[in-house]
């Protein structure tokens, strides 16, 4: 019966030899003949396990430094022949060929090779597996008759099935799907490494499951994390991150990287991927106090990111409120011990920058994905243009630079009122830019913050003068925005009429 074929002959060719000796010994004990290649065959022979060299099956030696071993009709015919097609089996017999019922293959470590910073193109090319991929695809295509294994974690389950009589068709199909996913990932990694065009005609995606998640944004949504999140963050304490935690962590870290640790200590407080308070100071404790003062309600259950190692003074201050996550480049031992006392708090160490790590941002849409460059353009104040009669003072210019760094991380429509070292009011996600300004002003009033003498940043142009007039009425004396409205002259005139300074950056920072 198809899918219940007896395994008589196995082919083994593995780079990762984890568990291969034990697995091969178990197959041998079941009376299964083993064919093997190169290093795999030597390892098995040294362990006392009979393994027939593949050249004995093909009648052809390995050539070209091992580049050609299994690429031969004697191997692939044995894999591809359908056992339920008499003509196939007769053809095998006519050529004195034998079916191969089990393939155990894993591939050269291309991804690990190109991860080395000093790798050369020639070294990368040497790690592109050809024969192994062909074996996996041939075996997986004929999965009702041929078992295919790419992962040592599956050895034990297959052995259990073989000892019980056979491996059921459903499991054979699962293993075949895993093999095709393995080769797809492998080829996608190679294509990404060799690709030079920025937006290719075909976008191969290959991410391994990093971890399953309890659920997605909401409990009724299934979810998992793919890729290598652990390359950027090490979790030092707390239960596993949720889907929303991961989104907030990325948003918080992306924002805090706007502020180099060499310039000042910086603290960013995030809720639902939006900043609710950002500040810089001589030390983290003072930066925390200023950031928290922006909004004393929203930070509860939020995410805190800092750009310097956490010390005990900062730890004692943030320990007074509940925060889901604290992200820092490091934690002093006494600070770590204190923060670990709350079991529901997660502590993450940021181990490498996320800015610039990904060439592209992806977002799913019906039928596909949207792809764009991340909005990681550096702040270049020299390219800004003063458009009002009055230029910003030095203090206002410093505040404008600070506000512009923050506003790009606020959901559109975004308005940020700020001083040179802290946010004063943040308006996020309103359909009207004027409403975002009103929200920011209201939040500042709720926090008891005086906006007189503040500056205001807008992530996109002011389409009408009313937004600027509202900002000036709230107390702002300088404004930064991209510019580009058909009513720019009207908007500039409103600023001039109030004696305010306005700067055009020429760069928009929509965030949806």
Swiss-Prot record:
PROSITE patterns: MGS
PANTHER family: BIFUNCTIONAL PURINE BIOSYNTHESIS PROTEIN ATIC (PTHR11692:SF0), BIFUNCTIONAL PURINE BIOSYNTHESIS PROTEIN PURH (PTHR11692)
Gene that encodes it: purH
Domain MGS-like: 1-150
Keyword Zinc assigned: no
Family: Belongs to the PurH family.
MF GO annotations: IMP cyclohydrolase activity; phosphoribosylaminoimidazolecarboxamide formyltransferase activity
CDD domains with a match to the protein in the record: IMPCH (cd01421)
Record flagged with keyword Hydrolase: yes
One GO location term (cellular component): cytosol
GO BP annotations listed: 'de novo' IMP biosynthetic process
Protein name, per record: Bifunctional purine biosynthesis protein PurH
EC number(s) stated in the UniProt entry for this protein: 2.1.2.3, 3.5.4.10
Domain topic, free-text comment: The IMP cyclohydrolase activity resides in the N-terminal region.
Natural source organism: Chloroflexus aurantiacus (strain ATCC 29366 / DSM 635 / J-10-fl)
Lineage: Bacteria, Bacillati, Chloroflexota, Chloroflexia, Chloroflexales
Pfam families in the record: AICARFT_IMPCHas, MGS
Keywords in alphabetical order: Hydrolase, Multifunctional enzyme, Purine biosynthesis, Transferase
């Amino acid at each position: 019966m198809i899918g219940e074929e007896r395994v008589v002959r196995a082919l083994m060719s593995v780079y990762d030899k984890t568990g291969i000796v034990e697995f091969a010994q178990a197959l041998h004990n079941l009376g299964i003949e083993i064919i093997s290649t190169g290093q795999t065959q030597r390892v098995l022979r040294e362990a006392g396990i009979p393994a027939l060299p593949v050249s004995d099956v093909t009648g052809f030696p390995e050539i070209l430094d091992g580049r050609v071993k299994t690429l031969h009709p004697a191997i692939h015919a044995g894999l591809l022949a359908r056992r339920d097609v008499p003509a196939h089996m007769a053809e095998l017999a006519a050529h004195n060929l034998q079916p191969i019922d089990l393939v155990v293959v894993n591939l050269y470590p291309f991804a690990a090779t190109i991860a080395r910073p000093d790798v050369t193109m020639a070294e990368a090319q040497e790690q592109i597996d050809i024969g192994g991929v062909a074996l996996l695809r041939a075996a997986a295509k004929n999965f009702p008759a041929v078992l295919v294994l790419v992962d040592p974690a599956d050895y034990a389950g297959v052995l259990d099935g073989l000892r019980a009589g056979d491996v059921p068709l459903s499991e054979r199909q699962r293993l075949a799907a895993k093999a095709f996913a393995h080769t797809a990932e492998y080829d996608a990694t190679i294509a990404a490494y060799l690709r030079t065009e920025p937006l290719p005609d075909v976008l191969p995606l290959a991410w391994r499951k990093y971890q399953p998640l309890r659920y997605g944004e909401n409990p009724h949504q299934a979810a998992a994390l793919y890729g290598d999140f652990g390359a950027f963050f090490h979790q030092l304490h707390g239960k596993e991150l949720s889907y929303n935690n991961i989104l907030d962590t990325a948003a918080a870290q992306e924002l805090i990287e706007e502020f180099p640790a060499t310039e000042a200590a910086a603290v960013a407080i995030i809720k639902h991927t939006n900043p609710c308070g950002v500040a810089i100071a001589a030390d983290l404790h003072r930066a925390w106090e200023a950031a928290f003062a922006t909004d004393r309600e929203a930070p509860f259950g939020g995410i805190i990111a800092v750009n310097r190692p956490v010390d005990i003074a900062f730890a004692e201050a943030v320990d007074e409120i509940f925060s889901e996550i604290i992200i820092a480049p490091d934690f002093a031992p006494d600070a770590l011990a204190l923060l670990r006392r709350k079991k529901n708090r997660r502590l993450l160490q940021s181990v490498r920058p996320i800015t610039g790590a990904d060439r592209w941002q992806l977002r799913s849409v019906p039928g596909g994905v949207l792809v764009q460059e991340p909005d990681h353009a550096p702040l270049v104040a020299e390219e800004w243009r003063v458009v009002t009669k009055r230029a910003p003072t030095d203090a206002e210019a410093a505040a404008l630079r600070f506000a512009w760094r923050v506003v790009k991380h606020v959901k559109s429509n975004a308005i940020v009122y700020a001083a040179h070292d802290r946010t004063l009011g943040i308006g996020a996600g309103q359909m009207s830019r004027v409403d975002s300004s009103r929200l920011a002003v209201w939040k500042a009033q709720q926090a008891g913050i005086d906006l007189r003498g503040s500056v205001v940043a807008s992530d996109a142009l002011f389409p009408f003068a009313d937004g600027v007039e509202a900002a000036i009425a709230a107390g702002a004396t300088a404004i930064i925005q991209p510019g580009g409205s058909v009513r720019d002259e009207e908007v500039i005139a409103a600023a001039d009429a109030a004696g305010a300074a306005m700067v055009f950056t020429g760069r928009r920072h929509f965030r949806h």
